[in-house]
């Protein structure tokens, strides 16, 4: 049964360690910038495939204590629950920064020590990349930029350490916020964190990476 908003968190439910937060749109609203190269059905399939991959990779990481998916979508929530995630409901028109800020407040109430924000469209994300970002000093802001260096594709911090920005030049905005708060910044640059699939060029890069991986496997046979 769906419950709107956040539920009170009792002391018995407190969960320390690193919480991962994955904000996910409703599938019918996702990946609209790929409409020129993918059908509506194909875009939804891509959305679920990447989201499932990200959630599964986070769940498998020994560095992640808990996983919270923020979404307005019943179908997305069903997929996330099946993978072992908790759900925090949000309105359909909620932006990523607001969704993540609400999640951070929920996690702070639950006793979470650190929060890792991860978008649901990172098809190359793996356990090593998660481990790398999670090794940021506890009192620092750990960040991973996207391919063009302007967006933030991964961020780890203490709850409430800085305000969150997930549109426009968010990578520099997060660095400026950390600087204003007197907090050190730890930057991780890797292909696994950098590639998010929003545009046709991103899809081409992903397809190229798959071909490269297959080629490497064949060369080892």
UniProtKB/Swiss-Prot annotation:
GO terms for molecular function: GTP binding; phospholactate guanylyltransferase activity. GO terms for biological process: F420-0 metabolic process. It catalyses: (2R)-3-phosphoglycerate + GTP + H(+) = 3-[(R)-glyceryl]-diphospho-5'-guanosine + diphosphate; (2S)-2-phospholactate + GTP + H(+) = (2S)-lactyl-2-diphospho-5'-guanosine + diphosphate. The keyword Cell wall biogenesis/degradation does not apply. It holds the Pfam family CofC. Keywords: GTP-binding, Nucleotide-binding, Nucleotidyltransferase, Transferase. Pathway: Cofactor biosynthesis; coenzyme F420 biosynthesis. Its EC number is 2.7.7.106. Guanylyltransferase that catalyzes the activation of (2R)-3-phosphoglycerate (3PG) as 3-[(R)-glyceryl]-diphospho-5'-guanosine, via the condensation of 3PG with GTP. It is involved in the biosynthesis of a derivative of the hydride carrier cofactor coenzyme F420, 3PG-F420. Can also use (2S)-2-phospholactate (2-PL), with lower turnover, and has weak activity with phosphoenolpyruvate (PEP). Belongs to the CofC family. This is 3-phospho-D-glycerate guanylyltransferase.
């Amino acid at each position: 049964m769906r419950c709107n908003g956040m539920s009170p968190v009792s002391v018995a439910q407190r969960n320390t360690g690193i919480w991962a937060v994955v904000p996910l749109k409703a599938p019918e609203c996702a990946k609209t910038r790929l409409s020129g190269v993918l059908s509506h059905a194909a875009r939804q399939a891509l959305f679920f495939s990447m989201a499932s991959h990200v959630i599964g990779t986070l769940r498998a990481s020994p560095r992640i204590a808990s996983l919270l998916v923020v979404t307005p979508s019943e179908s997305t929530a069903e997929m996330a629950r099946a993978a072992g995630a908790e759900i925090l409901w949000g309105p359909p028109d909620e932006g990523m920064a607001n969704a993540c800020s609400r999640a951070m407040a929920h996690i702070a109430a639950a006793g979470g020590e650190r929060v890792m924000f991860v978008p649901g469209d990172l098809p190359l994300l793996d356990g090593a990349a998660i481990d790398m970002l999670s090794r940021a000093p506890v009192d620092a802001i750990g960040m991973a930029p996207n391919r063009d260096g302007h967006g933030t594709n991964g961020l780890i911090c203490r709850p409430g350490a800085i305000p969150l920005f997930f549109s426009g030049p968010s990578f520099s905005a997060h660095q400026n916020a950390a600087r204003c708060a007197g907090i050190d910044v730890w930057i991780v640059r890797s292909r696994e964190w950098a590639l998010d699939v929003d545009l046709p060029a991103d899809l081409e890069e992903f397809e190229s990476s798959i071909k490269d991986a297959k080629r490497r496997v064949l060369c080892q046979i």
